[in-house]
Amino acid sequence: MTKRRRFLALLSGTLASTVVLTGCLGNPPNSTSSGGTTPAPVATNANLETNTINLGFIPILEAAPLVIGVEKGFFAKHGLDVKLSKQASWGAARDNVVLGSTGGGIDGGQWQLPMPQMISEGAISNGKKVPMYVLAMLMSQGNGIAASNTVKDGNLSLDLRKSSPDFFAKYQQKEGRKFRAAYTFPKANQEIWIRYWLAGNGVDPDKSVELLKVPAPETLQGMKNGTMEAFSTGDPWPSRIAKDNIGYLAATTAEIWKDHPEEYLAVRSDWVDKNPKATIALLKGLMEAQMWLDKPENKDEAAKILSSRKWYNVPLPVLQESLKGQYKIGAAGTPETDPKMGPLYWASDRGNISYPYKSLTLWFLLESMRWKFYPGTVDTIEQAKAINDKVTREDLWQQAAKELGLPANQIPTGSSRGKETFFDGVTYDPENPQAYLSALKIKK
């Protein structure tokens, strides 16, 4: 019997359960136990291979299901003690997952894509290949591109051709340097969003602006001291920049691509293969946390939990507005009135958010090809598909959903969400990725 068949055989015997999370991950920096409430006791009758997993998180909205899973007991309900540790940066998270919990690091956690795929290939881990599995999407939307008040007269917006024609060329001519735009980790989600926004407006991000990496916690100070004029990251940081009157929200990622994929839960494959029942328990707890987060009546409680010093250490009003999608858009601060343009955790107009559609995880690899992020690793569509098929585990999500008792019509069975359309009119058809790449006018 092959390793994979043994794994599936174990899955077939996994007991049905529900989900709860308790939490403390003893991995520096800033390891935390549960936030302001008493952790729920871990169920002792779950018959899991292990009752503990160590996960890393970055304090932005994408991590909310992990924190809520701990605080509200969803993971613990399924017999799993999820120990969360706040990571100082995405680079620290990468280094810690390479170490693994047995080496004092983490087993997995929250990731920008394609970080898990590239860690699996050794492309961002100094050549050390640490195979990982992408298990679920944590959130959709909830990110934005903030601009400094120093360029408020530039009126940067989603549609730069209309609001700010020739802005970047004029800026360079006036200031004697290029406009600086930052992100939190190179060659992943947040750099991809700012690149897509610029390129979709006819601005070549490799020629017309200077792109740089700045850790999320340094966002506010960086904007204040002029390190950068724009920043792409997850809320609450863009919203806080606007609320603190340091800058304004030029565009949200929901405007760039409605119901877009965001960050994902991914875990080392050796942990998953060794602990198939615990993996299913983890997914069930995550799903219940995502369902809870998506209910409007829970937004204020979620904000209160997340705002605590143990978790995000961010003012409560900022998180309340961020979780509800109460943005003020553009230099004029126009209120966003559609809650569906804010962060979504379980359901959207396109269906289930948590399910890791391969069509969506593939897109990040296609963008990596577009910008030649990982030469020698992702140069062709065939390479991208092979990596994607190896890392993205839709089958585990489906198994967990069935055990959780979700109705059959709420459990996706395919690997594609269908055609996707972006703000610039470009369409991504997962059945024809080459057509998507060919349609992109600006690329490397």
Feature names for model-found ranges:
Residues 275-391:
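Secondary-structure end/capping motifs
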Residues 144-146, 264-267, 271-272:
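Short glycine- and hydrophobic/aromatic-rich loop-to-beta-strand nucleating segment
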Residues 69-72, 78, 96, 100, ...:
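Structured segments of extracytoplasmic/periplasmic soluble domains
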Residues 362-444:
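Conserved C-terminal helix/tail region of periplasmic/extracytoplasmic solute-binding proteins
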Residues 34-213, 229-239, 246-259, 433:
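Short, glycine-/small- and polar/acidic-enriched structural segments
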Residues 1-50, 409-418, 422-444:
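Short, low-complexity disordered leader/linker segments with a strong preference
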Residues 65, 70, 92, 96, ...:
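Extracytoplasmic/secreted proteins, especially bacterial periplasmic and envelope-associated proteins
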Residues 95, 107, 207-249, 268, ...:
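Ligand-binding pocket segment of bilobal, Venus flytrap-like solute-binding proteins
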